[in-house]
Amino acid sequence: MNNVQALPGAFPLHADKDFNTESEWVILKLLCRPLMEIDTTDAEELSRASGGQIRIERADELIRIVRISKLPGLGTWIARLMGEAGFDEAQVRTVKAEKIMARINERMGYPLCNDATVRALADLQIKWKGQREGSGT
């Protein structure tokens, strides 16, 4: 869980909420695969291991959500929205915050993410860039 507070008026980027269905939870439990550790596998393998009960497309989405949620400052709630909007972890780091939030709003059908949310994500992107440059990666 992230221990970050949202900017006033911004969507709580740090918030965690369940993002998998109950049946997905049961399948992963039976496979002895903790949800937050599926980011080390690929979608085809996860789908195959589930006997096809988790479609490849959904497995890919779940993996993206987990990877995004591991970025500092982001929780599973916004990670789910980003993953369902088609973004992966690398894109969340590099695509302009305005474009990410616009796609989420478009997909939702209403303005969930406002200008304050865009600024909050842009600030996180600057921090991530600084962390990557500082680590030499």
What are these regions (language model features)?
Residues M1-T137:
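C-terminal extensions
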